[in-house]
Amino acid sequence: PLPAIVFGGRRAKPAPLVYQSKSWDNGVFVGPIMASETTAAATGAVGVVRRDPMAMRPFCGYHMGDYFAHWIEMGKKVKNPPKIFNVNWFRLDDEGHFLWPGFGENMRVLEWIVKRCEEKVGAVETPIGYVPDPKDINLEDSGVSEETLKELLTVDKETWKQEADGIEEFYKQFGDRLPKELSDELATLKANLNK
């Protein structure tokens, strides 16, 4: 069986280096809110958040709300659905430098994902999901300090409150075809951010 599904976006701030969803429905919520910030390689303004649900926007041949509902239903049909993770290799510091080296170093994060699926490591609960305990990411010879890793794994509630507002606005386009489970997950996220 498939143990994990990994989504990813390109965000300067909100998304941590990696986080695990709290449940299948929560993971399906994470997929549609995937976003990247436009770069100089794209036409238009730089730094604009562009949402691309599950990286399928250009490829989905039917209503995305129905596509999300299909994912929700899959989770009900599978006895042990895969764990869902989100990665963000592109987090920046306040000076605009990448905090994570990327490329082959990404294997360090994938190793944590595999260990989570095998129940060999724990995690720290946050309002958005589970992030690694910094001690569970092997930093040996990576050039990344423990302090930088902690910054990479930080979930800033105020930034995520703004993100939640953006998600709510994004979801409006799906109208009544947005699965209730995703609306419920958004409400839960907002409640978690206000604790």
Task: Set out the residue ranges of the language-model regions.
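Conserved NTP phosphate-binding and transfer environment spanning the P-loop NTPase/kinase superfamily
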Residues: 1-195
